[in-house]
Amino acid sequence: MRYDLVFEGGGAKGIALVGAYEVLAEQGHSFGRLLGTSAGAITAAFLAAGYSSGEMMAVLTERDAAGAPVFASFMGEPPPFTAQEVGQGAFRRLLGGVDLTFIPGFVEDPLKDQLTAAIARGGLTRNFLALVERGGWYSAHSFLAWLRAKMDAGTYNGQPRRFSAMTLAQFYTATGVDVAFCATDTTGGRQLVLNHRTAPACPLVYAVRMSMSIPLLWDEVIWRQDWGPYQSRDITGHTIVDGGVLSNFPLELFVSDAPFVTAVMGPKQNNPVLGLLLDDAAPVPSPRGLLARVTITPGDLSTVQRLRGLVNTMLGARDRQVMEAFADLVVALPAGGYGTVEFDMSEPRRNALLDAARAAMRAYLAAHPPLPAASGLAAPAAPGVKNLADTLATRLLTPPAP
């Protein structure tokens, strides 16, 4: 059976999505359309690029030369600031508005310049300046480099995989996979669904990068002119962040067949829809194996904990109405007690998360034998359900009034 798959966002917890898909593939099922947000966007990209569940598992459990999870490097130090960021950025302008009346002007301005430059060179102060100037405490440069490398690694249909430089239109032509990535345009105040229809000139790797850009954690992405328009609308210079800000689990986009939604998602396929949800309310059984040491240093602990708390709270606001309306289409993968940015996850904790996801998928498939469904539903829709999907999907995709 081919399923149209929706992958929820959840940061480091997203490895559970791979464990669940592993079971789906083992039981002979495959995918049609793919839709992902944040960590779900990463999973969708790898599937569309031809990675098997085993290959994805190997990639997502990689460790560096020091034995640390490669994902831990994704919270990288900010790259050096430009002279413009230091001399004319938001922080320097803020200082410029503070008048130190007891210091002569010819001394005050150079002093403020020196202070800003010192902050830009510091440790945590450098992260603070990155948050002010770039919208994120950490840099995602290492993630982007990693994703590019993986999109060019191995083979696809017997040929070297070479997807890293492709646009979304080129990627669709090369693979034939209808894949979409959710992001949020904070400048325009709207949800973006990035695919070969809506943003054909957008680079594949940046579509994924934008989808996973958790606000305040990673630096924002600014839409470039050479990425072309979004749905024929110029959004050059707009700030784009994680799609989970507006909807972390937009399953209704695959259920709805409203004309406005179809213009974004394309025509519905004769595949049942299946959403993989990371359920923070469902506890994960105790880890198997020996406990691993904590890799975060004490100096970083309070900052990391605060950011984790903020991010987990923000992205924990689930699309409850959608999940309740389409409960039969949702596989709830236990993720209770796991953090969105727990990229230093120990091997025993990771194994426990994967085991729980596999068990949840097996239980779902046993209870929901697959049935062909042109409606996108695994069974005939209850009265009003399709109308609800149309309403929710249209509301999500409609840009705000000027």
Listing of model-derived features with the role each one plays in the protein:
Residues 1-37, 45-402:
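Patatin-like phospholipase
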